[in-house]
């Protein structure tokens, strides 16, 4: 059993599609082991996305991720990292396959509805960023 981190981003929270996105995960074999709604501070967003700090989009990403609440979740299941990424679809919703979360709920490459860990190693680090072990069950 594998775990991964998912973030439902401010655009999707604002559009009130959190339940629809969670349903996609659950109906495709991923179980929610932990979840909470949080408002990221700029400091939190910069730390979480530090890997992108030298990229030209970094400041816009931080601004976007702090523009409203997000829902962070630990998803659990067989090949959870790959399954979550498959369900999310391509980063750019215009390139995302029909029926994926981003194709159905995202507006743009920036406001793309969801974040998901891109590797098992990053999943562990990202989960630990948001959750204490006692919060995951």
Swiss-Prot record:
Signal peptide: none annotated. ATP binds at residues 9, 57, 85, 91, 102, 112. NCBIfam families: PRK00668.1 (NF001908). Its EC number is 2.7.4.6. Its cofactor is Mg(2+). This is Nucleoside diphosphate kinase. It is found in: Cytoplasm. InterPro entries: NDK-like_dom, NDK-like_dom_sf, Nucleoside_diP_kinase, Nucleoside_diP_kinase_AS. Pfam families: NDK. One of its GO terms (cellular component) is cytoplasm. One of its GO terms (biological process) is UTP biosynthetic process. Homotetramer. Belongs to the NDK family. It catalyses: a 2'-deoxyribonucleoside 5'-diphosphate + ATP = a 2'-deoxyribonucleoside 5'-triphosphate + ADP; a ribonucleoside 5'-diphosphate + ATP = a ribonucleoside 5'-triphosphate + ADP. CDD domains: NDPk_I. The active site is at 115 (pros-phosphohistidine intermediate).
